[in-house]
């Protein structure tokens, strides 16, 4: 059984983008290749339990076990040594990616306090989109009573689009709530 957004992409989005940009082949149409969720945890230097809690939260959000990211080099100013765990990240592809994107757009984003849409300027120039989430409690999988601290995370959506304009059209076709 394919994800709802994946079918929506094949049936509606592809045709819409071919009409808008005049692609000659279906394979030229931009698509989302992966979504990366990253949680940077600077406070993990002092408390090892922080990594466990964050990993648990990210597992619930993504439905997949994240990897713990370690410091590449020592930085005395931040009191970290090489190999210290400083974050956690998970990469979603395929069906899980589309299911996460569906939940994110329809359920999680509307739960953000004072939500007026996401910025249309957070593209990196190569057709990828980044969005920062200030609190992990916007996700319905996270129970408010069971969290130890409010943590933010970065969501990076990687596409095959050649330009920001194409990537924005792709995400807008997925009903991404962009600010005007």
UniProtKB/Swiss-Prot annotation:
- Hey, which family's this protein in? Belongs to the universal ribosomal protein uL5 family.
> What's the protein name?
Large ribosomal subunit protein uL5
Q: Which cysteines are joined by disulfide bonds?
A: none
Which is one GO molecular function term here? structural constituent of ribosome
Q: Which organism is it from?
A: Ralstonia nicotianae (strain ATCC BAA-1114 / GMI1000)
Biological role: This is one of the proteins that bind and probably mediate the attachment of the 5S RNA into the large ribosomal subunit, where it forms part of the central protuberance. In the 70S ribosome it contacts protein S13 of the 30S subunit (bridge B1b), connecting the 2 subunits; this bridge is implicated in subunit movement. Contacts the P site tRNA; the 5S rRNA and some of its associated proteins might help stabilize positioning of ribosome-bound tRNAs.
Q: Which is a Gene Ontology cellular component entry for this protein?
A: ribosome
PANTHER family from the xrefs? 60S RIBOSOMAL PROTEIN L11-RELATED
Assembly, in brief, is: Part of the 50S ribosomal subunit; part of the 5S rRNA/L5/L18/L25 subcomplex. Contacts the 5S rRNA and the P site tRNA. Forms a bridge to the 30S subunit in the 70S ribosome.
Specify whether Electron transport is a keyword of the entry: no
Name the gene for this chain.
rplE
Please name the GO terms of the biological process aspect recorded for this protein, alphabetically: translation
Q: Which InterPro entries match?
A: Ribosomal_uL5, Ribosomal_uL5_bac-type, Ribosomal_uL5_C, Ribosomal_uL5_CS, Ribosomal_uL5_dom_sf, Ribosomal_uL5_N
- Write the record's keywords in alphabetical order, separated by commas: Ribonucleoprotein, Ribosomal protein, RNA-binding, rRNA-binding, tRNA-binding
């Amino acid at each position: 059984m394919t994800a709802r957004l994946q079918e929506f992409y094949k049936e509606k989005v592809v045709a819409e983008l071919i009409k808008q940009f005049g692609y000659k082949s279906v394979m030229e149409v931009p698509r989302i290749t992966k979504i990366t969720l990253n949680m940077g945890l600077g406070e993990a230097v002092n408390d090892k339990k922080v990594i466990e809690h964050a990993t648990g939260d990210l597992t619930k959000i993504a439905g997949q076990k994240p990897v713990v990211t370690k410091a590449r080099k020592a930085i005395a100013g931040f009191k970290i040594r090489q190999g210290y765990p400083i974050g956690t990240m998970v990469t979603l592809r395929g069906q899980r990616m589309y299911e996460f994107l569906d939940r994110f757009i329809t359920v999680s984003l509307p739960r953000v306090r004072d939500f007026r849409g996401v910025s249309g300027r957070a593209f990196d120039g190569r057709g990828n989109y980044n969005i920062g989430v200030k609190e992990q409690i916007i996700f319905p999988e996270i129970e408010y009573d069971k969290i130890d601290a409010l943590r933010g995370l970065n969501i990076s959506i990687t596409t095959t689009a050649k330009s920001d304009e194409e990537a924005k059209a792709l995400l807008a076709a997925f009903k991404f709530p962009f600010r005007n």
